[in-house]
Amino acid sequence: MSSVYKTKNLQGHERPIKQLKFSSNGKYIFSASADRKVIKWDYKNNTKDFIYQHQASVNVICISNSDRYMFSGDSTGCIYVWDIDSNENIKKIQFEKLYNITSLNISSDDIYLIVTCSERGQKSNNFIAIYLVEDIIKKTPKEETKEKPANLLQIPSMMNQSIKSEPAPEIYKKIECSERNTKFIKSCFTNMNKSILISRQDGFLEMYDFTNDKLIFSGKFHNDEILDFDVNYENGIIISSSKDGEMCVINLNSFQLINRFKPTNPVRLLNSCRIGIIDNPYYLIPGTKRGISIDTLFDLNTLDLNKLVFFENEKDREKAKKFKNKRQIILAIVAGGQDSKFVTTTEQKEGGFEIIIYNVFSGEKLAEFLDHFGPINTLAIHDNVLASGGEDSSVKVHDINHYLFDK
């Protein structure tokens, strides 16, 4: 069950990584950083494909499901729109006021862009703005710019090109936070774009009916700010991670709590979480042979895995028992660490900088590994490939199969 690689290290940023995203086809990883850059990585070949330049720290990015457009938001409230194939900057949108953009997401049909933002210094002016993507990407005439020489790395980039900003298009729909002493942190579409899932600063998760403009559900799952969440529609689950050091697994339909994890003690910030669906290489298919035909000897629904003789060695037999003959394994992956302002005097093992992988439903810890020298700020996953970005400015690419099956 050996994997091709354990971990790849992608070096190209000078400041902390803020967010990572895979392209829908899994070909590229996009990394947004406080160094004002987004890098498009051809990670399979360990190369930079393109560098996109902002004029401030890039905090959030999202990729259209068609893999045609990238949207990136920075600390000055600017949203840049990029054509991924040509790497052309289509538009730079500047809000009228100085907004802090905390999340960018796109609907599964690529029709709506959902932006979570708050006005700097204003507790009450916090809202979610939903735009029509066709209004966002609409091209406008540009002034001609002289071609500049390539940067020293000889990587194509937008570094030296000046981009004229434009006012934001008309908001299609706006959701304002009704509670005065909290803020929206993140939002995304769910349920075939009929609903919007929202996380709040006070530990609440909310579901908003996008079609009928009403709140469906509001419930408190954490004792502090929810820093991240992820949704898996096929299995009907949400996972959320928080400043309170806990990760919750929640039923998407009933909003009942399924599991609660507290990975570290003392409490560390859980900055990012992702759901992973991994094929089980130890799954025994009815009618196939691993030494003998199993379907004639066992009812697979009540298979006694302690009596297995189909695997070559004891290690494989133990793995087969561990994963209980499930065709797929559903994972909850979480990472974070000690607050970055305290990190300079912290030992790597004491900071809670590990990536931890759990079985969503059983709650069993399946793997734990340490690969960053500081807090992990963001996770992204595509199939069995997990990417992590840290305060140490590095992007790591991990083969999950190695940590689950090769150890």
Which functions belong to the PLM regions below?
Residues 43-46, 84-87, 133-136, 210-213, ...:
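Short loop/turn segments that connect beta-strands within beta-propeller blades
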Residues 1-14, 45, 167-172, 362-363:
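A short helix->beta-strand "capping" segment at the edge of beta-propeller domains
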Residues 29, 70, 113, 196, ...:
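Hydrophobic beta-strand positions that form the internal "hydrophobic ladder"
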Residues 39, 80, 129, 206, ...:
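WD40 beta-propeller blade core
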Residues 32-35, 73-76, 116-124, 199-202, ...:
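Conserved strand-to-loop turn within each blade of WD40 beta-propeller repeats
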Residues 24-25, 65-66, 108-109, 191-192, ...:
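Residue-level detector of Asp-centered blade-edge/turn motifs that repeat once per structural unit
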Residues 10-17, 52-58, 94-101, 176-184, ...:
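WD40/WD-repeat beta-propeller blade N-cap
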